[in-house]
UniProtKB/Swiss-Prot annotation:
<feature type="binding site">
    <location>
        <position position="245"/>
    </location>
    <ligand>
        <name>Mg(2+)</name>
    </ligand>
</feature>
<comment type="function">
    <text>Catalyzes the conversion of glucosamine-6-phosphate to glucosamine-1-phosphate.</text>
</comment>
<dbReference type="Pfam" id="PF00408">
    <property type="entry name" value="PGM_PMM_IV"/>
</dbReference>
<dbReference type="Pfam" id="PF02878">
    <property type="entry name" value="PGM_PMM_I"/>
</dbReference>
<dbReference type="GO" id="GO:0005829">
    <property type="term" value="C:cytosol"/>
</dbReference>
<dbReference type="InterPro" id="IPR036900">
    <property type="entry name" value="A-D-PHexomutase_C_sf"/>
</dbReference>
<dbReference type="InterPro" id="IPR005846">
    <property type="entry name" value="A-D-PHexomutase_a/b/a-III"/>
</dbReference>
<comment type="similarity">
    <text>Belongs to the phosphohexose mutase family.</text>
</comment>
<dbReference type="GO" id="GO:0009252">
    <property type="term" value="P:peptidoglycan biosynthetic process"/>
</dbReference>
<dbReference type="InterPro" id="IPR005843">
    <property type="entry name" value="A-D-PHexomutase_C"/>
</dbReference>
<feature type="modified residue" description="Phosphoserine">
    <location>
        <position position="101"/>
    </location>
</feature>
<dbReference type="Pfam" id="PF02879">
    <property type="entry name" value="PGM_PMM_II"/>
</dbReference>
<dbReference type="Pfam" id="PF02880">
    <property type="entry name" value="PGM_PMM_III"/>
</dbReference>
<dbReference type="InterPro" id="IPR050060">
    <property type="entry name" value="Phosphoglucosamine_mutase"/>
</dbReference>
<dbReference type="InterPro" id="IPR016066">
    <property type="entry name" value="A-D-PHexomutase_CS"/>
</dbReference>
<keyword id="KW-0413">Isomerase</keyword>
<feature type="binding site">
    <location>
        <position position="241"/>
    </location>
    <ligand>
        <name>Mg(2+)</name>
    </ligand>
</feature>
Amino acid sequence: MGKYFGTDGVRGVANVELTPELAYRLGRTGGYVLTKHESTRPKVLIGRDTRVSGQMLENALIAGLLSIGAEVMRLGVISTPGVAYLTKTMDATAGVMISASHNPVEDNGIKFFGSDGFKLDDATELEIEGLLDEAEDTLPRPSGKELGFVHDYYEGAQKYLHMLRQTSDEDFSGIHVAIDGAHGATSSLAPRLFGDLEAEVSTIGTTPNGLNINEGVGSTHPEHLADFVLEKGADVGLSFDGDGDRLIAIDENGKIVDGDKIMFICGKYLNEIGRLKDNTIVATVMSNLGFHKTVAEHGMTALQTAVGDRYVVEEMRKNNYTLGGEQSGHIIFMDYSTTGDGMLSGVQLLQIMKATGKKLSELAAEMPVFPQRLVNIRVSDKNGAMNGPAVQAIIAEVEAEMAGNGRILVRASGTEPLVRVMAEAPTQEACDMYVERIANVVRENYALQEN
């Protein structure tokens, strides 16, 4: 990670850390780096989620892009994977998404995609950072007819939804789906998509007002959708995050089906129909031990990467793997998309339910899970906390006690000032004990307040 770019673009408190001035400079520097080799006028697509700060940052970013001569196509409110898909399929030079995903409304972020629809590599981000830190802006300043221009392309969302519909061989008639749009980017898109596929649709979290994104709703609060599924008697619940790149599902009994289970269900089905490249699923170190055991029992291989969907995608691209993802709900179907896509994951999950005739609870029950506990601690110095001798000592002590019968993972968040402490063990009581012992040491030495 660099000075400005984290694991998922540039993020911060809008108008405090991520200011319109910084957005303008990102438009100029990012636009220049991504378009400098173009022989014709570069075309850049911009989408955003529903945050109140989105329009402020969008306008500043557009001004920067226009100042280096780009044509800007404004997509309006759309999901992150929607921007990635349209960037790739419309021969755009670059795409930009303005969102802080599952973060609270005060935050926002700016994420760039290359012309291939993939997030930028580290070298490109560092080149942009170098220009941001230059004392003087010496980038080209075209004038007259060479200046850029902007126009709206709101029909891009319909083109993206059409692609999603085409990924299913089944219609979803007879399936009642409950949708939680997190008051975010999928609020209008997801009900339209699943309605077009003939599902019966009930919704919560689909009335954004600029301030309520992720507020008690969405994939980080799936318990609310679980209650709604039971209330409506739905067959399945689909909970998206603010920018629509992740999915947490709910079965008909109100039980949460996380990214690990979704990956297993989809991987098993794809393997059975001969569409899982090398029988391999790419996951991260956060995936449950139960996921790894069950994947192996079904004749598949699970590879591990660092946490972050960019690292999953990186590994997938090396060997053209077709399925990967994270426990948090980022699922990548490389046959269709270049990034995690919550709505695409939902379509694939419902297609499997329809094709197999099985309830989601039946599909999910094939993968048992080890009890797991995750605690987030807001800290003053996440790197210092990770490397502190007291923290390292308690981690070593707990791992020795586990003696291989479970695991501990302590890591710094890539997008927030948090240290995450996770444990898996044969019992929930053991999980809780191990996590609290480590978390208490982190709190005593580095905590600001617990999240």
